[in-house]
């Protein structure tokens, strides 16, 4: 914008300097303004730029030709008119192109849409074109005042009217000098009128510029109230540039008026001069306001930067504080979690103390009841001393009950197989109650302490004497389980069954029970015998071929298990019982291995149910005796079943049997570990063996483990494993033994919530004999019954 005004002022300066600074008056009769002898009409606003450009080019050509002729007189100009006009025209083209590119191309067909800058520029170019014409030169030489055209259309219209009315001759020199002087006053008057009219138009243009200035000031005042600092700054800059442009235009117009007017413009009235001064004051005020706004904008920018910095710092501080608070909350949460864990542990410890205290109280109560029963039993034994012929062989029933309770619910007895030849020095034994077994294996010494350790030369009678109190407790309504455990070939079946000339635990226990029942009231004995072979349950007392039985959980509310298809035999006397046991032993699966010629390949379970009822009461107590002969744990490479093709055609079967035996014994170890740790879930369902032993290993029962070990050096590793298992089993606590009532439905029951063990003795009564018969009941489900009173 400033470059344009500088260029424009430079053009006029050069022009006035070349022409001597003289003024000119437009001649309405100039023949050079004609085009082909025809008067020109008013040009349309949209044709102004192109026509004006053509006129400027023609005028530039004329100027160059004339300047060439008068070069000697006037001298060369500082800048050519053609170059100045080209610069001015290029600026106008760029200005119009910029407006078109911004999407604000003015409609030149409407007078209100023409920009003021373009209007003023057009007026100046029109004036410049007139001064370069021959008539303008003549007017300048005469020193008359020009009628500066404000609008090209006005100038063109006036020129056209003058041309059409005057009809000048093509040769100006031929006009006489006197005639020219005669017409000069008329010309001056007419030109004076034209000058006044053009002066009014210029004053109107000045008023329009003043109004635009006021609009810009109003726009500037509106921008002061705006919120967006960046947009306001851009708008202020734009308005400042427009304000400068308007000031330059106003100054240029004022200078032109002063230069072309008659001296110091004597014709301007005081009001016009005051208006001009007022406009100048408003312009100065607008400049001051713009500068103040610029200063205020800078201050606001600084304030905004400060606010942004403060906001950024506040955000950082808030974020840091939130992170610190979050870390503190996490730390407090971790502390609360640790506190909660400690409280839970303390609660568990308190529960354990309460449980221990409860058990201690129950134990003290049971001990007191046992002492009372001991006294009553001793009194009864003193009265019946003369009536018992074999009183010295077995202790009274009350004594056995108290002794069983004092020794604990689970006892571990250990029996060593007699060594063949020289005894091994790797195993040392301290027999007796609380005896120890010390082994030396791979340079390390292991010591195990058990409830009772038998010497190597212990007889079957000595072994049974330790189990006799537990067997007799069945007559009082308790559930007892005796099972043998150990490596294959260590004598488990020998200790449980024994030969006919030296019977084992099972024949002696049955003989003792029938002897005691023969002197008491009415007793009903039921027998069942099963084996677990390759995880299949088979009935050893079935009349037909053995079938695989299905083990199910008992009905809801009754507990226990049920074996569908299992037969229960009523046993009237001892002879029938021995016959049935012989039948079951003959049906059991046995085979020869490298370690044992008569190795049991299955687990055998004999269940004897005793129900006794006094004549006054229809419902009596029920006791259960479980005799379990477990198959021996074996290592397949030692038993000779690792390569079945080379050793035995049935080696594959022996291998499957060994794998099934080891898996079931491993499941039994898991059950014992869960019972020892008092876990809420005991994995009885991991094996068929543990499922059948669930009634015998539940709370309130009595269990006795007879461990069979070997003292041979090659069996020392398996012996240590068996001793470790027995030591863990000895730590299992099943709780106080409880008595059980017989169910009303007649189904054999194996476990219920009963009264604690007491030393009350049973009076033997003869039992009527009856032939063996098959019980209609076909399951061994266990029914829970409420506790009942002991028999009188």
From Swiss-Prot:
One of its GO terms (biological process) is microtubule-based movement. Disruption phenotype: No visible phenotype. The gene is Kifc2. InterPro entries: Kinesin-like_fam (IPR027640), Kinesin_motor_CS (IPR019821), Kinesin_motor_dom (IPR001752), Kinesin_motor_dom_sf (IPR036961), P-loop_NTPase (IPR027417). Residues 186-347 form a coiled coil. CDD domains: KISc_C_terminal. GO terms for cellular component: cytoplasm; microtubule. ATP binds at residues 486-493. This is Kinesin-like protein KIFC2. Belongs to the TRAFAC class myosin-kinesin ATPase superfamily. Kinesin family. Residues 22-45, 142-184, 734-792 are annotated as: Disordered. Pfam families: Kinesin. Gene3D superfamilies: Kinesin motor domain (3.40.850.10). Keywords: ATP-binding, Coiled coil, Cytoplasm, Cytoskeleton, Microtubule, Motor protein, Nucleotide-binding. May play a role in microtubule-dependent retrograde axonal transport. May function as the motor for the transport of multivesicular body (MVB)-like organelles in dendrites. Residues 744-764 have a biased composition (Low complexity). The lineage of its organism: Eukaryota, Metazoa, Chordata, Craniata, Vertebrata. It comes from Mus musculus (Mouse). Residues 765-774 have a biased composition (Pro residues). GO terms for molecular function: ATP binding; microtubule binding; microtubule motor activity. It is found in: Cytoplasm, Cytoskeleton. Residues 142-169 have a biased composition (Polar residues). Present in axons and dendrites of neurons in the central and peripheral nervous systems. Transmembrane segments: none annotated. Its main location: cytoplasm. Residues 409-732 form the Kinesin motor domain.
């Amino acid at each position: 914008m400033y470059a344009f005004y500088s260029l424009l002022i430079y053009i006029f300066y050069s022009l006035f300097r070349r022409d001597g600074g003289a003024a000119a008056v437009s001649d309405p009769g100039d023949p050079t303004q004609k085009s082909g002898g025809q008067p020109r009409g008013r040009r349309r606003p949209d044709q102004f730029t192109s026509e004006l450009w053509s006129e400027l080019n023609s005028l530039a050509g004329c100027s160059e030709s004339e300047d060439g002729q008068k070069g000697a007189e006037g001298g060369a100009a500082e800048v050519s008119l053609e170059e100045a006009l080209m610069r001015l025209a290029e600026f106008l083209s760029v200005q119009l192109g910029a407006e078109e590119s911004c999407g604000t191309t003015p409609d030149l067909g409407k007078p209100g849409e023409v920009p003021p800058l373009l209007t003023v520029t057009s007026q100046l170019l029109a004036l410049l074109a007139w001064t370069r014409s021959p008539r303008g030169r003549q007017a300048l030489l005469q020193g008359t005042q020009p009628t500066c055209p404000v609008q090209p259309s006005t100038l063109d219209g006036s020129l056209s009217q003058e041309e059409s009315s005057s009809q000048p001759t093509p040769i100006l020199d031929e006009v006489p000098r006197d005639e020219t002087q005669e017409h000069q006053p008329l010309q001056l008057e007419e030109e004076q009128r034209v000058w006044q009219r053009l002066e009014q138009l210029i004053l109107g243009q000045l008023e329009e510029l003043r109004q635009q200035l006021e609009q810009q000031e109003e726009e500037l005042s509106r921008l002061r109230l705006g919120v967006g600092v960046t947009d306001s700054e851009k708008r202020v800059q734009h308005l400042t540039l427009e304000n400068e442009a308007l000031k330059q235009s106003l100054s240029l117009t004022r200078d032109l008026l002063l230069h072309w007017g008659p001296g110091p413009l004597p014709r301007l009235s005081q009001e016009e001069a005051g208006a001009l001064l007022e406009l100048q004051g408003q312009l100065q005020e607008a400049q001051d306001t713009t500068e103040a706004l610029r200063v205020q904008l800078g201050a606001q920018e600084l304030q905004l930067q400060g606010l942004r910095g403060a906001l950024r710092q506040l955000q950082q501080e808030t974020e840091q504080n939130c992170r610190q608070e979050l870390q503190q909350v996490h730390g407090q949460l971790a502390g609360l979690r640790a506190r909660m864990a400690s409280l839970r542990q303390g609660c568990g410890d308190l529960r354990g103390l309460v449980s221990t205290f409860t058990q201690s109280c129950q134990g003290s109560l049971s001990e007191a009841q046992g002492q009372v029963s001991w006294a009553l039993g001793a009194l009864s034994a003193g009265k019946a001393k003369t009536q018992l012929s074999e009183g010295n062989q077995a202790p009274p029933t009350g004594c056995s009950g108290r002794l069983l309770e004092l020794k604990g619910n689970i006892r571990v007895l250990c029996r060593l197989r007699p060594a063949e030849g020289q005894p091994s020095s790797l195993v040392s034994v301290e027999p007796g109650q609380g005896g120890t077994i010390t082994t030396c294996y791979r340079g390390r010494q292991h010591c195990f302490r058990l409830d009772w350790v038998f010497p190597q030369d212990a007889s079957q009678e000595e072994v049974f004497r330790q189990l006799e109190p537990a067997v007799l407790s069945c007559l009082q309504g308790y559930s007892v389980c005796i099972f043998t455990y150990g490596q294959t070939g260590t004598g488990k079946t020998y200790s449980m069954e024994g030969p006919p000339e030296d019977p084992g635990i099972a024949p002696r226990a049955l003989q003792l029970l029938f002897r005691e029942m023969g002197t008491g009231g009415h007793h009903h004995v039921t027998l069942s015998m099963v084996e677990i072979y390759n995880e299949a349950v088979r009935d050893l007392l079935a009349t037909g071929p053995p079938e695989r039985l299905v083990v199910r959980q008992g009905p809801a509310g009754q507990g226990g298990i049920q074996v569908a298809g299992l037969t229960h035999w009523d046993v009237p006397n001892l002879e029938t019982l021995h016959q049935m046991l012989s039948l079951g032993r003959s049906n059991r699966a046995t085979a020869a291995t490298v370690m044992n010629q008569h190795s049991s390949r299955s687990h055998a379970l004999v269940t004897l149910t005793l129900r006794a009822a006094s004549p006054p009461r229809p419902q009596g107590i029920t006791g259960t005796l479980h005799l379990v002969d477990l198959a021996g744990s074996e290592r397949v490479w030692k038993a000779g079943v690792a390569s079945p093709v080379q050793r035995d055609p049935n080696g594959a079967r022996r291998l499957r049997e060994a794998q099934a035996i080891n898996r079931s014994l491993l499941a039994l170890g898991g059950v014992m570990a869960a019972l020892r740790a008092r876990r809420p879930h005991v994995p009885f369902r991991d094996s068929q063996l543990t499922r059948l032993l669930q009634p015998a290993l539940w709370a309130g029962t009595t269990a006795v483990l007879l461990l069979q070990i070997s003292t041979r050096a090659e069996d020392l590793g398996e012996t240590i494993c068996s001793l470790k298992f027995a030591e863990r089993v000895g730590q299992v606590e099943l709780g106080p033994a409880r008595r059980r009532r017989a169910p009303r439905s007649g189904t054999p029951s194996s476990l219920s919530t009963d009264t604690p063990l007491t030393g009350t003795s049973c009076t033997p009564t003869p039992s009527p004999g009856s032939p063996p018969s098959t019980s209609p009941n076909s399951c061994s489900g266990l029914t829970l019954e409420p506790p009942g009173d002991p028999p009188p």
